[in-house]
Amino acid sequence: MPMSSRDRDLHPGHHHFGSCSPLSQLWPGPEPKSVKGLYYSRARKVGNQDASPEANLKEILVNVGGQRYLLPWSTLDAFPLSRLSRLRLCRSHEEITQLCDDYDEDSQEFFFDRNPSAFGVIVSFLAAGKLVLLREMCALSFREELSYWGIEETNLERCCLRKLLKKLEEAAELRREEAAQRQQQRQACHSEVQASRWARSMNQLREMVEDPQSGLPGKVFACLSVLFVATTAVSLCVSTMPDFRAEEGKGECTRKCYYIFVVESICVAWFSLEFCLRFVQAPNKCQFFRGPLNVIDILAISPYYVSLAVSDESPEAGERPSSSSYLEKVGLVLRVLRALRILYVMRLARHSLGLQTLGLTVRRCAREFGLLMLFLAVAVTLFSPLVYVAENESGRVLEFTSIPASYWWAIISMTTVGYGDMVPRSVPGQMVALSSILSGILIMAFPATSIFHTFSHSYLELKREQEQVQARLRRLQNTNSASERELLSDVDDLVPEGLTSPGRYM
């Protein structure tokens, strides 16, 4: 009699890990030899075209979704809590129909209106002792089938059990999110009923600013925001051209420089207005300033106003000897603040699902990125002294002047960038370089797989949430339109026959 999955786990000679487990490479176990005819003696599929087998007390005939199986009662002895095994204890037709959908007393055939594919896998487990998930069936639906037939899900193979547990966690998380959304909707509906005109206007403003899919105002607002971000990026790039830099160095401001300033002022005015609108509609003002995108907005907008304040200041008459150093400091501050304008590009994350996925992946993979930095730090600390010693012992031109100076070479080599500014010339140094490059490839590959899977999962999750929100909005719109039609029909019913419109009735 073959062992079940639980028995094989307890038996040291029958340990078997799924293909998904990395331990299968470290501890390969031999597959047990199959006994010819063992499966047929424990379970047998009977075709519909075959003659019905004779009813006896040693076998049970099961019909699941039109597929018939013949199982000896001895096969079910190892599973006394299963649904099929409990049929053996039934003494009346009423007890039998409580466990199955129908029963034919002449042929002693039990009928079940269940998934035949899932039952085929369960029959294979009853006969051969190996339970796996059905690829073409949802894991949660297969779990329901296991619960119906009285088979514990812990009998699944390790790889399939991990997959099922992962699906259960995802389903639980989705239910929690849906419950939170329903709670928010109930609170929003309750607040809308009791809200004043100001609250309703704030809700409309929130939908326009935060949700581009809420309607035409939201789409127009999002398009304008993206347009101004693109305009700011273009103006920033144009302002760094040699002609503009030469004018800036001379302290002159021609018409072209003036146009760039006007474009930047218009964009900053729009961004300031958008920031104020987001702040006004935010229910929690403190939580608003903690948002990462709002912090980016502040860092991107503030340099413009600070640069205006700094440029308006001038040294007093008594400080004329140090005016040159003062102007140099002011110019440095202006250049640094001007470079911060590139943060406007990060505002696109409000309207881009890909950028939102990237930010969510970085937040979820903080541990993986930390491990990557740790691996790189250890490897750089290892290879920098080696290449320094190898190159200094050769007695050639010294490019590696010190161990800290070799850190740059180690980082560039391990990330496979290879600028070529520092190149080992000796054979030992080249061997160290080869080792560092190979180590860098392996180190970068270890967390890359986990980060990629997290990115893919986060993208699908955000896309699913967006589709759910859009579907919910469509349902609300359909519900509102249906309610309006019902209201109009009720009003028409109230109008007397001699009148044609509610206005005339009034």
Swiss-Prot record:
Native species: Mus musculus
Query: Which GO terms fall under molecular function for this chain's record?
Result: potassium channel regulator activity; transmembrane transporter binding; voltage-gated potassium channel activity
- List the membrane topology term(s): Multi-pass membrane protein
Q: Where this protein primarily resides, as one coarse class?
A: membrane
Q: Which gene encodes it?
A: Kcng4
What free text does the record give on domains?
The transmembrane segment S4 functions as a voltage-sensor and is characterized by a series of positively charged amino acids at every third position. Channel opening and closing is effected by a conformation change that affects the position and orientation of the voltage-sensor paddle formed by S3 and S4 within the membrane. A transmembrane electric field that is positive inside would push the positively charged S4 segment outwards, thereby opening the pore, while a field that is negative inside would pull the S4 segment inwards and close the pore.
User: Per the record's keyword annotation, is Cell membrane included, yes or no?
Assistant: yes
Record's protein name: Voltage-gated potassium channel regulatory subunit KCNG4
Tell me one Pfam family matched here. BTB_2
Q: Where is this motif: Selectivity filter?
A: 416-421
Its subcellular locations are: Cell membrane
Q: Which InterPro entries match?
A: Ion_trans_dom, K_chnl_volt-dep_Kv, K_chnl_volt-dep_Kv5/Kv9, SKP1/BTB/POZ_sf, T1-type_BTB, VG_K_chnl, Volt_channel_dom_sf
Domain of life assignment:
Eukaryota
List the Extracellular topological domains.
239-259, 313-326, 389-403, 424-430
Keyword Transmembrane recorded? yes
Q: Which residues lie within the membrane without crossing it?
A: 404-415, 416-423
Instruction: Fill in the subunit field for this protein.
Output: Heterotetramer with KCNB1. Does not form homomultimer.
An example GO BP is: protein homooligomerization
